[in-house]
């Protein structure tokens, strides 16, 4: 099985909260696609709550589009990581890590402005596979933690696992 890009970086050295360009690729027509690792928690040290990450999934996707989409950027998808330490965001375009970090922080401010659970988009059995597994309070706690900590940048060159280590794993 091929080694995926996300498993060639040393998770023990990742900062969080932090933005990392996980991958660059191009479509056959030449459009740039960028995948970002939006790391909310330090891997193997902390984890996002089940209800909090699920609620963020519903809120974050819209808020990030509000703050980042433009003439040269369009978000394709924002999905939670299975390890529950962050989200992957795929988009058309090549915004800087700083642009993404600023949009992320603005989105967290928006999460704090949501007043009631009923304001969470798609919070119903027709549009959500586990619509009862939400917590606005937990999502807002996560948002407050991100805002308080600020968002830094993780660079692949700083996190790259050596061929020697990869060979031993």
UniProtKB/Swiss-Prot annotation:
It comes from the Bacteria. This is S-ribosylhomocysteine lyase. One of its GO terms (biological process) is quorum sensing. Its cofactor is Fe cation. It holds the Pfam family LuxS. Keywords: Autoinducer synthesis, Iron, Lyase, Metal-binding, Quorum sensing. It is an enzyme of class 4 (lyase). The gene is luxS. Its EC number is 4.4.1.21. Belongs to the LuxS family.
């Amino acid at each position: 099985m091929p080694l995926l890009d996300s498993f060639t970086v040393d998770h023990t050295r990742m900062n969080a909260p932090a933005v990392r360009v996980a991958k660059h690729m191009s479509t056959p027509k030449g459009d740039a696609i960028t995948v970002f690792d939006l790391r909310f928690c330090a891997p193997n040290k902390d984890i996002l709550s089940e209800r909090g990450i699920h609620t963020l999934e519903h809120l974050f996707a819209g808020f990030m589009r509000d703050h980042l989409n433009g003439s040269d950027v369009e978000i394709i998808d924002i999905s939670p990581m299975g390890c529950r330490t962050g989200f992957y965001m795929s988009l058309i375009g090549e915004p800087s890590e700083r642009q993404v970090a600023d949009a992320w922080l603005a989105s967290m401010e928006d999460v704090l402005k949501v007043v009631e659970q009923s304001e969470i988009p798609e919070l119903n059995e027709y549009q959500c596979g586990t619509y009862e597994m939400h917590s606005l309070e937990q999502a807002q706690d996560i948002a407050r933690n991100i805002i308080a900590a600020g968002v830094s940048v993780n660079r692949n060159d700083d996190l790259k696992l050596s061929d020697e280590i990869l060979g031993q794993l």
